[in-house]
């Protein structure tokens, strides 16, 4: 983790907007969808890039791992890549709770600013199912994909 350890607790609402800015710095132009139904789970954030869908689960300092196993299973059916974004409370142990192909981003408060650290970049998700992935897209998104690929 980076910077000075701080005992200030970060909540989901404190993390989201700065996270979107951080992801845009890394990936360039992105589209963000929040609270997207993903099978039997609800993805906190779905990041759409020109070539992939990313499922992003936020575990703030106030969260527990209670639902994480089921969330991982569901995310792995739908997304090309997955991230878990964790507060400092979870940073030391999160890798024990997500597969090796999941990316891990830590977040902490440093001198009053939200600071992110890429602990591990995601690898391509081996469990993604194309039919599941397509099922979460809305009609306008599917039409756009068809247009990009010269399909009627």
Residues covered by each model-derived region:
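Conserved catalytic cores of phosphodiester-cleaving nucleases, focusing on short active-site segments
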Residues: 19, 45-47, 52-61
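Positively charged, polar, low-complexity stretches
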Residues: 21, 30-31, 43-48, 104-111, ...
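Short, solvent-exposed loop/turn elements at beta->coil junctions and helix N-caps
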Residues: 33-38, 92
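Short N-terminal edge-element motif at the start of the domain
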Residues: 23, 38, 43-44, 52, ...
């Amino acid at each position: 983790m980076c910077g000075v350890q701080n005992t200030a607790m970060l909540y989901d609402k404190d993390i989201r907007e700065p996270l979107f800015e951080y992801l845009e710095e890394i990936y360039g132009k992105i589209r963000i969808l929040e609270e997207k139904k993903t099978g039997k789970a609800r993805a906190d954030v779905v990041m759409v890039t020109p070539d992939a869908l990313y499922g992003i689960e936020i575990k703030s300092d106030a969260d527990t791992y209670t639902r994480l196993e089921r969330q991982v299973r569901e995310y792995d059916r739908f997304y090309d890549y997955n991230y878990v974004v964790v507060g400092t409370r979870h940073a030391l142990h999160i890798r024990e709770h997500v597969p090796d192909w999941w990316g891990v981003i830590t977040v902490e408060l440093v001198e009053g600013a939200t600071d992110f650290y890429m602990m591990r970049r995601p690898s391509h998700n081996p469990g993604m199912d194309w039919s599941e992935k397509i099922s979460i897209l809305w009609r306008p998104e599917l039409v756009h994909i068809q247009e990009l690929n010269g399909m009627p």
